[in-house]
UniProtKB/Swiss-Prot annotation:
Pathway: Bacterial outer membrane biogenesis; LPS lipid A biosynthesis. Keywords: Acyltransferase, Lipid A biosynthesis, Lipid biosynthesis, Lipid metabolism, Repeat, Transferase. This is UDP-3-O-acylglucosamine N-acyltransferase. Belongs to the transferase hexapeptide repeat family. LpxD subfamily. Catalyzes the N-acylation of UDP-3-O-acylglucosamine using 3-hydroxyacyl-ACP as the acyl donor. Is involved in the biosynthesis of lipid A, a phosphorylated glycolipid that anchors the lipopolysaccharide to the outer membrane of the cell. The active site is at residue 239. Homotrimer. It catalyses: a UDP-3-O-[(3R)-3-hydroxyacyl]-alpha-D-glucosamine + a (3R)-hydroxyacyl-[ACP] = a UDP-2-N,3-O-bis[(3R)-3-hydroxyacyl]-alpha-D-glucosamine + holo-[ACP] + H(+). Signal peptide: none annotated. GO terms for molecular function: N-acyltransferase activity. GO terms for cellular component: membrane.
Length: 347
């Protein structure tokens, strides 16, 4: 069903300041380029400020002090967050519970909450507990003893191994594996002896995990993904890692075993982190970096191996000049040799 709101209603919803016609009806959200006079748009990046003048939008979400060019406007401190909230308001439909559908398998001693949907092809093992308003899409597999909280969505082909715990308001996207064995082997002569992985994975509240990620169970105790953390597609988190609250882990990151991340840590795409390390609160690691040691809180690092980001920028600026520098050094060495030969012949 289409949603229509007045600008005044939207301003109240966002907690912003309305400038213009509060009775204007808005039916959707679009970009500065594509918005029509019945849609609202936003300016989050100053480089796009010139487009505000030419947009056809019925209203613009702007930061305080921005030029509105006679458009209706809602002024908010964080236009990007306001944009996200409006997308939820206009386009995210309420879920409709459908119960346990034909073709789903539910094991013994399973506790099911209210308003759930278990799609055909989903498998729920014995002694599983599922909270309220949970959706399990086709191909989801919950091994024995899994616990799932309220308002959880597991997309197609997610697998959660035995004994793992998923908190409230968690979303896990297709193909992700939670709780497979950690990569643990003891040297045994010329071979390797598998170390039984007896722990589990704990996913705390308000976590979102992308597609085809893998989070291994602990050898003992738990691998933990902290409250509010967001994990992108194709991320690997090894056994016994503890990820703090509200971290941001971007695609193709690999975190080796027993590493601990503090709160609000950001790891850029393809970062590799060695095992048994600690990365402090609010640290940021640039894309493709290799982290071989502990990282203090608040540090920004880049490079292989990772070091201070500002120093890395300076070092990176030198790299394209290395061929020229090599030629210059070779020429200087040649001149030095010639001078030495002249001095020797003059003696």
């Amino acid at each position: 069903m289409a949603v229509s709101k007045t600008l005044q209603e939207l301003a109240d919803y966002l907690g912003g300041t309305l400038v213009g016609d509060g009775s204007r009806q808005i039916v959707g959200v679009a970009s500065l380029d594509d918005a029509t006079d019945s849609q609202i748009t936003f300016l989050a990046n100053p480089r796009y400020a010139p487009k505000v003048a030419s947009t056809r939008a019925g209203a613009v979400i702007l930061p305080p002090g921005a030029e509105r060019h006679n458009h209706n406007a809602i002024m908010v401190p964080n236009p990007y967050l306001a944009f996200a909230r409006l997308l939820t308001l206009f386009y995210v439909a309420p879920r409709a519970a459908r119960g346990v559908m034909d073709g789903a398998h539910v094991g013994r001693n399973v506790k099911l909450g209210s308003e759930i949907t278990i799609h055909p092809g989903a498998v729920v093992g014995d002694n599983v507990t599922i909270g309220d308003r949970v959706t399990l899409h086709p191909g989801v597999v919950l091994y024995e003893g899994v616990t799932v909280g309220d308002d959880v969505t597991l997309h197609a082909n997610v697998t959660v191994y035995q004994g793992c715990r998923i908190g409230n308001r968690v979303t896990i996207h297709g193909g992700t594996i939670i709780g497979s064995d950690g990569f643990g082997y003891a040297p045994d002569g010329d071979g390797w002896y598998k170390i039984p992985q007896l722990g589990n994975v704990v996913i705390e509240d308000d976590v979102e995990i992308g597609a085809n990620a893998a989070i291994d169970r602990a050898a003992l105790a738990s691998t933990v993904i902290g409250k509010g953390t967001k994990v992108d597609n194709l991320v690997m988190i090894a056994h016994n890692c503890v990820i703090g609250e509200n971290c941001m882990i971007v695609s193709q990151v690999g975190i080796s075993g027993s590493t601990k991340l503090g709160r609000r840590v950001t790891l850029g795409g393809q970062v590799g982190v060695a095992g048994h390390l600690e990365i402090g609160d609010n640290a940021m690691i640039g894309a493709k970096s290799g982290v071989p040691g502990n990282v203090p809180s608040g540090t920004i690092m880049s490079g292989i191996p990772a070091f201070d980001h500002r120093e890395w920028l300076r070092a990176s600026a030198v790299v394209p000049k290395l061929p020229e520098m090599k030629r210059t050094v070779a020429a200087l060495e040649k001149r030095l040799r010639e001078l030495e030969e002249k001095l020797e012949s003059a003696v």
